[in-house]
C-alpha cells in the first residue's frame, strides 16, 4: 500500500527533484511534495515554494523554507491527522530543517482577501503543527511574493491560480506590520537575543 510515511522513508536519492541548489533541501521538498500528493489527492491544487529560496536571498544558517499548499477545501480531520504524521516523519529524517520549515494549508477562496482572513488555516512552523493558526499582516506581503516568485513543487503557474497584488496594499500591510508586530519586539530582549530572529531584523 502506498502511504505517505512509506514514501518519505523509502525514497531513493535518484528520485530527489532539484527544486533548489541545495541537495538536503531538495530531499525535504521532494519527500513532502510526494507525501502530500498521496494525503490530499484531489483536494490539493498546488504546493509552492516562496520566500528567500525563490528569489535568491537564502542563508543556509538562518533562513526558513517557506511553503504554501493551496487546497480546494479546508482540510478535514482525516487529512489533518495524516499531514501531521507526514511533517513529523520528515522532521525525524531531516533534523537540520525540522524547525525551519514553514507550510500553510490555505483554501483557494482565501486568496480573494486583501486583509488577513478571519478564518484560521492549518500551519506547520518551528517544528510544531497548528490545526488553526490565524494570519497576520504578513498575509498580503507573502501573497505578493508568492505571485512574483513562487516555484511550483506541485501544480501549475501560480499566476493562473491567484490574482496579482497591488503594491500599495503591500505597503499598507508593511506599515501595519511595523507597528503591530515589530515595534513591540524592540523591547523583548529574549526575542532580540535569538540569532534566528536577528537575521530577520537585518533583512
Task: Label every model-predicted segment.
Residues 51, 56-85, 100-105:
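Catalytic metal-binding acidic patch
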Residues 4-21, 80, 85-200:
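Conserved NTP/Mg2+-binding pocket subregion across the NTase superfamily
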Residues 2-48, 79-80:
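Helical scaffold of the NTase/Pol beta-like nucleotidyltransferase catalytic core
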Amino acid at each position: 500500500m502506498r502511504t505517505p510515511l512509506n514514501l518519505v522513508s523509502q525514497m531513493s536519492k535518484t528520485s530527489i527533484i532539484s527544486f533548489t541548489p541545495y541537495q538536503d533541501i531538495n530531499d525535504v521538498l521532494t519527500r513532502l511534495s510526494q507525501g502530500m500528493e498521496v494525503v490530499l489527492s484531489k483536494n490539493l491544487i498546488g504546493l509552492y515554494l516562496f520566500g528567500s529560496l525563490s528569489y535568491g536571498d537564502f542563508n543556509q544558517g538562518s533562513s526558513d523554507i517557506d511553503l504554501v499548499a493551496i487546497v480546494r477545501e479546508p482540510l478535514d480531520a482525516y487529512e489533518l491527522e495524516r499531514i501531521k504524521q507526514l511533517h513529523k516523519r520528515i522532521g525525524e529524517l531531516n533534523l537540520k530543517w525540522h524547525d525551519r520549515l514553514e507550510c500553510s494549508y490555505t483554501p483557494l477562496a482565501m486568496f480573494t482577501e486583501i486583509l488577513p482572513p478571519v478564518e484560521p488555516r492549518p500551519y506547520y512552523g518551528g517544528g510544531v503543527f497548528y490545526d488553526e493558526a490565524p494570519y497576520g499582516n504578513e498575509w498580503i506581503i507573502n501573497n505578493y511574493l508568492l505571485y512574483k516568485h513562487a516555484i511550483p513543487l506541485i501544480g501549475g503557474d501560480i499566476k493562473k491560480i491567484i490574482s496579482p497584488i497591488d503594491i500599495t496594499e503591500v505597503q499598507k500591510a508593511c506599515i501595519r506590520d511595523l507597528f503591530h508586530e515589530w515595534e513591540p519586539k524592540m523591547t523583548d530582549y529574549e526575542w532580540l537575543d535569538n540569532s534566528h530572529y536577528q537575521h530577520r531584523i537585518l533583512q
